[in-house]
A protein has these predicted regions:
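N-terminal helical capping/dimerization or prosegment-like subdomains
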Residues: 2-99, 106-109, 374, 483-486
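Zn-dependent metallopeptidase/amidohydrolase metal-coordination segment
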Residues: 23, 42, 367, 427-428, ...
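Acidic/histidine-rich catalytic neighborhood of metal-dependent amide-processing enzymes
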Residues: 135-219, 341-353, 503
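Short glycine/serine- and small hydrophobic-enriched flexible loop segments
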Residues: 144-151, 313-320, 493-496
Length: 503
């Protein structure tokens, strides 16, 4: 507890608003340049290239170096925890902390981009590039909001803050969040923390998150019609792309929306058979490469996506391109991909706080002679992760395969009427003139990993963006510059309001 934190003489709202306006006017181009520095780093996890000081691969390591350099240049005390995580402090009157955590790792770019994914493109008031909204752009904006308070102190417009303000740079959010597990094993939790990695106005709870890997029986290549099958880029995204190489037989390949078929010439067919481990001379060579193009979407909001894996499997099944040894497995995956609410696999349920369960078949691959499929389920309080797993495990076994649970995080809720949530909400409403209410979501952010935390903006999904602006985890990821400017204002106001609470 910080004594007299509520009595600390803070700047008036009028002065703070003036300082915010001036900072945006003088430093907006600096903010965009800092976002671009991070977007230029393809900072997705690559464990095959992990090394000492770079436990998640070279991309996250390089992004962390850049972020810590930014913080150091602003005058903060920057620290690197062996590449697992980094943090920067604005020292307060107490060692007790208020925290902000953003992540600077990303999912891979994937196909389908019309803009360069690893640099910021500015077009008609929007920034485009991998990470501009998830979560490099918001992280840079929040770091600059922290810098605003530092500059106000240097200019004699703000006192030393009652809490130490800590910005934590995460680099493993998109996969296992091992970065925050490492951080919490070595540091105490802040008294309260928010993460700019969700939507406004403020999220006070997150659904449970279940991940698993479904694996088919090992079918000898000579008995398979499907020689290869792959799709998606991440477990936590509706797959926007999928591709298979199949024995074509006498199939005439009827036209279908989103499906492209390429008959392989003799050379490519022989190469495909060799890659699959088949004897080219012993098997007919009429092969086809079939590609499905759907629409990617984050697994927390899958309703707007179209599963390319589901499209591709449906086409294969409808046209007799699946062998008997593979049929049960592909039929099972097709059921999972057929509906995002779990109704096709008897998992549909909901509750008052979280709404309905969602399910996504995210990434498909080959493992030896087996097919594999990741599954992402976001579940409310009316079902448990164990119950979800039991249902999916039974489906896998019935198809002759297995289902291995790889993650299960229970739902979490904060009191929406508590002082911290209300402070965040008040900052949002002050900046926007709205009378918004807190909400819950299916997304999984760092907030669930800490003892007292909330996810807080900056997305506003009810605002329409041009059709060429994509969402997080999809191609042409984009964000409006005005939205980020508004987020800067909200975060700057929030720091002031939280500092006046007895947490």
């Amino acid at each position: 507890m910080v004594e007299n934190a509520a009595l600390t003489e803070m700047p008036s709202d009028e002065l703070l608003e003036q300082c915010i306006d001036r900072y945006l006017e003088e430093h907006w181009e600096d903010i965009v340049a800092d976002i671009d520095k991070l977007v230029r780093i393809p900072s997705f996890e690559d464990l095959g290239e992990a090394a000492e000081g770079a436990p998640y691969g070279p991309g996250p390591r390089k992004a962390l170096d850049i972020a810590l350099s930014m913080a150091s240049d602003m005058g903060f005390e920057a620290h690197d925890d062996a590449g697992h995580v980094g943090y920067a402090d604005l020292a307060g009157a107490s060692e007790e902390q208020l925290g902000i955590i953003g992540h600077i790792d990303v999912v891979p770019a994937g196909p389908g981009w019309h803009f360069e994914p690893y640099q910021v493109t500015r077009k008609d008031g929007y920034l485009l590039g991998r990470g501009v909204i998830d979560d490099k752009g918001p992280s840079v904006v929040a770091l600059h909001a922290m810098n605003l308070w530092h500059r106000m102190q240097l200019d004699g417009q703000a006192p030393q803050l009652p809490y130490t303000l800590r910005f934590i740079f995460g680099v493993n959010e998109e996969t296992r969040m091992d970065d925050v597990h490492y951080y919490r094993a070595h540091h105490a939790d802040p008294a309260f923390l928010f993460t700019p990695d969700a939507e406004f106005p403020v999220c006070y709870g997150e659904k449970g998150i279940y991940h698993s890997l479904m694996t088919s029986a090992d079918v000898p290549v000579e008995q398979r019609s499907v020689l290869s099958f792959e799709g998606g880029t991440a477990v936590n995204a509706v797959p926007g792309h999928a591709q298979a190489v199949v024995r074509a037989g006498e199939c005439e390949f009827p036209a279908a929306q989103g499906i492209e078929v390429e008959l392989l010439d003799e050379h490519d067919a022989a190469a495909a058979l060799e890659a699959a481990g088949a004897q080219a001379d012993a098997v007919g060579r009429r092969l086809a490469r079939i590609t499905a193009t759907g629409r990617s979407a984050h697994a927390s909001l899958p309703q707007g996506g179209v599963s390319a894996i589901g499209m591709l499997i449906g086409y294969l099944l409808e046209n007799g391109l699946v062998g008997e040894g593979e049929r049960a497995y592909f039929q099972t995956v097709a059921r999972i991909a057929a509906a995002t609410d779990g109704s096709t696999v008897d998992l549909a349920c909901s509750d008052a706080d979280f709404g309905e369960l969602t399910i996504v078949a995210g990434r498909a691959a080959m493992q030896g002679g087996s097919f594999t499929q990741t599954i992402d389920v976001r579940y409310p309080t009316t079902i448990t992760g164990d119950e979800v797993h039991a249902k999916l495990e039974a489906l896998a076994k019935a198809a002759g395969g297995t289902c291995e649970k790889t993650r299960d995080d229970a739902p979490f809720l904060l009191d929406p009427q508590g002082p911290a949530i209300q402070a965040l909400l008040a900052s949002y409403n002050q900046a926007t003139g709205e009378d918004a209410k807190p909400f819950t979501m299916g997304g999984g952010t760092y907030a669930r990993e800490f003892s007292r935390a909330a996810s807080f903006g900056p997305e506003k999904p009810w605002e329409q963006a041009p059709e060429w602006v994509g969402g997080m985890h999809g191609p042409d990821e984009g964000v409006g510059e005005q939205l980020l400017k508004e987020a800067f204002r909200i975060y700057a106001l929030t720091i002031g309001k939280l500092m006046q609470l007895d947490l």
